[in-house]
Amino acid sequence: MTARLRPVLAGLPVYVPGKTVPGAIKLASNETVFGPLPSVRAAIEHATQSINRYPDNGCLAVKAALARHVSSLSAADFGPEHIAVGCGSVSLCQQLVQITASVGDEVIFGWRSFELYPPQVQVAGATAIQVPLTNHTFDLEAMLAAVTERTRLIIVCNPNNPTSTVVQPEALAEFVRSVPPHILVAIDEAYVEYLRDGTVPDSPHLVRTHSNVVVLRTFSKAYGLAGLRVGYAVGQPDVIAALDKVYVPFTVSSLAQAAAIASVQAADELLARTDAVVAERGRVSAELRAAGFTVPPSQANFVWLPLEDRTTDFVTQAAKAHIVVRPYGADGVRVTIAAPEENDALLRFARCWITHRDGAR
């Protein structure tokens, strides 16, 4: 007899990560090319001495360090009670859905955006309301218009993954002010460290001025800890307490906690590395545009190529050139900004590809 499983799971897509192909240039997962700093490596090594013990389930030292760090970057002050820690910001996003939405409820987000939002909402039994993007970024007015009495959560991915675009700080603040206060607004800032050109919002300050705002951040991108899985949320104490209630115990390892604390202590040195990525982002974007590609202005560590029906061919031909990029259906391709020599290889391929495509028309 077959076990009875939840019917909703039958149509649930399995998450497909960016491919890793031996010998190929991987531009599919938005990983940093920089390894951990020596101080972070030392903290990880020291933490291995006690891996026979369970990690601190409350992540108390991490929360204290993050509260100081976030306070130093914001116009507002925060304590550990304002911080939740999770197994990457993706886990915290799932926890947010769990504490806000169930059967009959609605969760709003722009689309296309982070591809795990829809299944996370579906697993909770809620309904995902996907609001189409305008010019590859969030249409905040349309998202507000989509609010109903069933809306429980709104997610704003900023910068947006995979389109790399950003909502301007003033527009984000006005949006938050316009959302009914009983609806939680989650600002997913996995790529916030790559923001430049006056686009950096003081989103933690929005947490202190609006009780329904929570900010998600991660150590997987700019901090280079993707393999250790640690992220955090900044929110009001009641929201944080609810997140902690649905946290799966011990999922943030002692190694991850030690690395996170050491990374925060070396934040200035680590984040200085993002300048090199931003410079390469500008160069790659400019050269792709010069070659004939449409490239929305990026504020992340990747660029978006809205190739539509040409997506599959681009990805297939890139793989033949030993370059792995990330396709998104028939919408487009996301390309990670990597080391200069890897970016050069991508540019050589892209020029050849678009020349061949244009010549074949």
From Swiss-Prot:
Which class of enzymes does this protein belong to?
transferase
- SUPFAM superfamilies given in the database record: PLP-dependent transferases
ATP-binding is among the record's keywords:
no
**Claim: Chloroplast is one of the keywords in the record:** no
GO biological process terms, semicolon-separated: L-histidine biosynthetic process
Sorted alphabetically, the keyword list is: Aminotransferase, Pyridoxal phosphate, Transferase
Catalytic reaction(s) noted: an aromatic L-alpha-amino acid + 2-oxoglutarate = an aromatic oxo-acid + L-glutamate
Cofactor(s) essential for the protein: pyridoxal 5'-phosphate
The record's section on InterPro entries has: Aminotrans_II_pyridoxalP_BS, Aminotransferase_I/II_large, ArAT, HisP_aminotrans, HistidinolP_aminotransfase, PyrdxlP-dep_Trfase, PyrdxlP-dep_Trfase_major, PyrdxlP-dep_Trfase_small
What task does this protein carry out?
A: Aminotransferase that catalyzes the conversion of aromatic amino acids and 2-oxoglutarate into corresponding aromatic oxo acids and L-glutamate.
Task: Please give the subunit comment from the record.
Answer: Homodimer.
What is the official name of this protein in its record? Answer: Aromatic amino acid aminotransferase
The protein's organism comes out as Mycobacterium marinum (strain ATCC BAA-535 / M)
